[in-house]
Structures are given as structure tokens and as C-alpha cells.
Amino acid sequence: MTDCHAQLLPIYFREPSVNLGLGSQRGKLPHLTGMALLKDARLYADSPEAYAFTSLDFERAAKRYGKVGGFAHLATLVKRMKASRPGALPLDGGDTWQGSATALWTRGQDMVDAAKLLGVNLMTGHWEFTLGAERVQEVVEKDFKPAGIEFLAQNVRTTDFNDEVFKPWVMRTLN
């Protein structure tokens, strides 16, 4: 999972209408939007997939299909995944601890607690670092380590000696 932006409840989510790819990536997935995305992915307009992945006819589609996401739905998916794939490791790709009023008020703690309840095994940060290095370290030490959640980041280093702050990768043997 990734990029829930601290939204615990379902929301009306609108994909961007522009996503510029640079150089050789211009005009290719994942930098396609709208009809170009639907055509490339072989999806139909006026479908649940069009609503989920494009901004086309957003207001009408939102009225038709409703809100998306939320941690209750995500928890159901994680539960199904773990049941059908024993040993699966839910990975949080970041952008989880920020983006809502409650996350702002709690410095991301509401989302940290939600990730622990969800059963996340591994996480890497993204905009979590806007909370500051001390806060990220605090969550890793006081919340994640006791819960058995590993925090990974390959591009976070100390300023003094350029040492890694977090493990850059992990390997697990499953089943």
C-alpha cells in the first residue's frame, strides 16, 4: 500500500489530469492520464476503473461510484491477502503519516497506530520526513521496533559521516 495521505475514512479521490513524463518516459505509463491512460491500459470510459484511475467526468463518476479507500476497506484487503497468501508481507510505501487534520494534530500518531493495527511488516518513508528527523526516529524506536515493523530508507544518511540512518533493504525467506 502507499500514498493514503492519512485518510482513515473513504474520500472522493480525483486523479490528476496532468502527469508529465520527462525524456524517454514522456507519453508512457505511469505518466499517462485521461483517455490516453484508458487506451493504453485497455480500460473503458464511464467505468469504475475510469473513475479510479482518471479524472474524466469526475463529478458524475463520483456521484455514481461514491467514495473510495479508507482503512476499513484496506484492512479487509490485507486480511484477504494474508489468508490467500500465507507469509505475505504488507509493505507501506510511505505518504501515510501526513495529509489530514488528525495526522497534523497528532504528528502522524493516528496513522502510525493504524499501520500497526493493519499489520504492516515493512515501511519506507516519503513525506513522513516533513515531520522531522527526530519524529521519524521516535516512531521507529518507540512504535515500530516493539511492533516488529522494519523501517527502510536507502537515501537517508547522517550529515557528519554519511552513514546510513536506516537499513536500506531487507531480505526475507517465506514459506
Where do the PLM segments sit?
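Acidic, metal/ion-coordinating pockets
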Residues: 1-175
